[in-house]
């Protein structure tokens, strides 16, 4: 499943295609959304916001299209009039004079009014987004030490969108490798230096990934600046200590780590 950096890149692509352009056609597959089609004709996308793995597509009339791709949803950008050859089921079409964005296969799609943005179950539950430029290491440190999260093992905590939105499995293992910790640690047990390093890594690594690499290809190491240090590298040498990277399972997900330098 794509993680925060890949979701933000998808949002960037959607914005680049249609932001600010009047919508000439709008189509929704779900009956409960049909009534909004006419309300959006002539409107434009003001911006596309990411909240973890959810996208919020905002319009000037106050409406916001909420979509969560879950496992199978995917957005595509096409030239207007082009009909992609695909077996996927179309859910949403937002068309402008020259570009059209299409959402396929997703099932979690809603139209929200301003007051619903603060009461929507997912948006209420999800934590601060790691790619939010206003989120600081100090705030992350406060969350790590809060009663809600300080007793949680990192193996599960770093996958919990209520802690920080946008983290996922490859970010989990890369962050813990960066700070030299295993997944069984808890924030309450860290010393000040470890806590500070973790708070910074929780923001720096997702932002570095977003800035310097594209979609995740779990079978290849990219030539971009960001590259995996341990993810999908079991059996290889750790570049930091020369130990052998191992693979196990933590919180029901594959976990990659180096026993030589992660303690």
Swiss-Prot record:
E.C. designation(s): 3.2.2.-, 4.2.99.18
Binding residues annotated for DNA, in chain numbering: 70, 125, 169
Requisite cofactors: Zn(2+)
Disulfide pairings: none
Active-site residues, Swiss-Prot/TrEMBL: 2-3, 53, 253
Top-level taxon of origin: Bacteria
SUPFAM superfamilies xrefs: Glucocorticoid receptor-like (DNA-binding domain), N-terminal domain of MutM-like DNA repair proteins, S13-like H2TH domain
Protein name: Endonuclease 8
Gene: nei
